[in-house]
Design a protein with these regions (language model features):
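Long, well-ordered alpha/beta core segments of mature domains
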Residues: 1-196
């Protein structure tokens, strides 16, 4: 999926999950030496998927909806139920989930081990981070980027500044002949899916 390189922060998160998958597969091979490589791959994939769900449900979602709404609508995890449909609604995937675009910072922060600005590889304007995986390889790796994601808050939305300019006026301009507008793309996607 080419979107892994959409921006270097996203690239660093994907690399983290791939590394964890591979670490788990190696550990599972020691515990289950008769498993095929396909079984090792799939079992590690399931565990990483579960990690991701735990992070989203327990760490991310309470900050998004607030503790009262979280407890009222989700509450304690009742355990796996094979009768629950795991799919998401088209309206959520197409429209509602796009709300996270509003929390994207105009800067991709790279921080040192003390969570301070990285002097050797400074933070990067978002529009210069689109489809530039070489920045990860040649400019300090994923650790400074992951520290930037952890150590700096998401952008706070204000009524007059919802979506940063890099997403409205410079989307992919650094690597493309023309810039795109993410808000316009989101609206068009909704129209394509028949969302009012």
């Amino acid at each position: 999926d080419v979107r892994v390189n959409e921006n270097i922060a996203l690239t660093s998160l994907h690399a983290l999950f791939v590394r964890e998958h591979n670490r788990l597969a190696r550990a599972l091979r020691v515990l289950n030496p008769t498993w095929s490589s396909e079984t090792l791959y799939q079992e590690a994939r399931k565990i990483v998927g579960a990690f991701n769900q735990i992070l989203v449900i327990n760490e991310y979602l309470p900050h998004i909806v607030g503790p009262d709404a979280y407890n009222r609508h989700l509450g304690q995890y009742p355990g796996y139920d094979e009768n629950v449909d795991p799919t998401i609604a088209n309206v959520f995937a197409t429209a509602a989930f796009r709300f996270a675009h509003l929390a994207i910072q105009p800067i991709i922060f790279r921080l040192d081990e003390n969570y301070q600005n990285q002097p050797q590889f400074p933070s990067v304007p978002l529009f210069e981070a689109f489809f530039s995986p070489w920045r990860v390889i040649f400019e300090g790796g994923i650790d400074p980027l992951l520290r930037g994601l952890i150590g700096r808050p998401a952008k706070l939305n204000t009524q007059d500044h919802m979506l940063v300019n890099a997403l409205r006026e410079k989307l992919f301009a650094f690597t493309s002949h023309i810039a795109l507008d993410l808000a316009a793309l989101n609206m068009q996607r909704s129209r394509d899916h028949g969302i009012p």
